[in-house]
A protein has these predicted regions:
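An N-terminal assembly and electron-transfer interface module characteristic of large anaerobic redox
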Residues: 1-413
Length: 413
């Protein structure tokens, strides 16, 4: 018998604030601005103390994957802070729709709310029709604006990591990021983002103006399960740690994951020999998104001071060489392909973020590292485990050992 749950209604759009967990700080600031433009009051959660983990441990089974524990813990810690009226908030959580346990976070969250907050509605953000809320509709104009937010977020994240390790004047890179975030958020909250070409130029010019030292630091790629790869809360501020350690972080963009999800439906039709509405729509969607990502790459190519992102078709070629595009559980072949592309393009040092309980990630990331090293013998891949009992000291010590090994290489002495 299915338990009834509170739905987010049309009337709640006027009275409720939607709380959103923080996974990608840059991207999600733009996404919340877009949602505000379409009449949704949203707030991006910033709480990140140990209490987040403790709440997750108290309310989620300890055998559940670490990202679920953190997301649900962040929600409950925020609700218990006294900052929010439980009768005037809703919670938003994503569902991938795949075999990964992330598709069940929604039900785990509702279970955690039953005792103290049964009146709080939970909104599922999904693109596969898993669940719908009467008061939250993903219209085509909204979806297009969300795609724009992802593209701009990817660009700002990439440029930030290419500038921050080398800035002459401390704080210039953060100022460029804050200025571009504010400018784009204002556009999103107004009539919309407007011209992509002009916005790309706005972002690129802002970061190109950051004075940088004329030196080259070792690049360290970051791959792994999507939440732990991107979330500073989950990975203990991994990018900041690498920058402090004298490295340049290289983080694949979120659009790669979006393209991966779109092309998987196309791959299913090719592998299993069928065509239907889903494969045709996914093929058109993939081509459209790929064209947008390539236009972004061309905009970056005009600035010789920056490196552009890898073309997604190159990632697919790496997947065909190293694994198989039929492996799509969780982040599937994408993680293996990202490791291959990073190594192929000179980012030989790679941190693989491994959250507890993420079985697909252990197979397609840690389990495939040997295959990547066979293809690229100079690749230095280090898997870092993240779970409630893992101390940041242990994680940082493993990273420090990796950095020490990098410095021992002749080219970095």
């Amino acid at each position: 018998m299915e338990t009834k749950h509170v739905q987010f209604t049309e009337e709640m759009r006027k009275t409720h604030t939607i709380l959103i967990p923080d996974m990608l700080p840059i991207h999600f600031k733009l996404i919340t601005a877009v949602l505000g433009r379409y009449g949704y009051k949203t707030e991006l959660l910033q709480n990140s103390a140990r209490a987040v983990v403790d709440e997750g441990l108290k309310n989620v089974h300890n055998d559940t994957c670490y990202p679920a524990l953190l997301v649900i813990g962040q929600f409950l810690d925020a609700l218990k802070s006294g900052k929010y009226d439980p009768d005037k908030v809703a919670l938003m959580i994503s569902q991938t729709g795949g075999g990964c346990r992330a598709s069940n976070y929604l039900h785990l969250l509702r279970k955690a709310l039953e005792a103290e907050y049964p009146q709080i509605p939970v909104i599922s953000l999904n693109f596969s029709g898993l669940e719908k809320s009467p008061g939250f509709k993903l219209t085509l104009p909204l979806l297009l604006k969300l795609v724009d937010a992802v593209l701009y977020g990817d660009l700002m994240m990439m440029l930030y990591n290419q500038c921050k390790p080398y800035e002459v004047n401390e704080g210039d890179t953060d100022a460029a990021l804050a200025a571009t975030e504010l400018a784009l958020a204002k556009k999103a909250a107004g009539r919309g983002f407007g011209s992509k070409r002009k916005n790309y130029k706005l972002i690129l010019d802002a970061f190109a103006a950051v004075r940088r030292k004329n030196q080259e630091k070792p690049r360290v790629g970051i791959v792994g399960e999507i939440y732990v790869k991107y979330s500073p809360l989950a990975n203990n501020h991994l990018e900041e740690f690498l920058i402090r350690g004298g490295c340049e972080p290289v983080v694949p963009g979120l659009m790669d994951f979006v393209l991966y999800c779109a092309v998987n439906n196309v791959n299913d039709g090719r592998i299993y020999g069928f065509k239907n509405t889903m494969t045709r729509v996914s093929s058109l969607l993939y081509k459209y998104l790929l064209s947008l990502n390539r236009k972004l790459g061309k905009a970056v190519d005009k600035y010789v001071c920056f490196r552009s992102m890898d073309d997604f078709e190159e990632l697919r070629k790496e997947a065909d060489k190293l694994i198989n595009q039929g492996v799509k559980m969780g982040e599937g072949w994408l993680i293996t392909a990202e490791m291959g592309c990073l190594a192929k393009t000179g980012t030989l040092n790679i941190v693989c973020t491994q959250p507890f309980g993420c079985l697909p990630n252990h197979i397609v990331a840690k389990g495939m590292s040997r295959r990547v090293k066979d293809e690229y013998p100079d690749a230095n891949i280090v898997a870092i485990d993240y779970d409630p009992s893992a101390t940041s000291v242990n994680q940082e010590n493993r990273l420090k050992l990796m950095l020490a090994n990098i410095r021992e290489k002749p080219e970095h002495k």
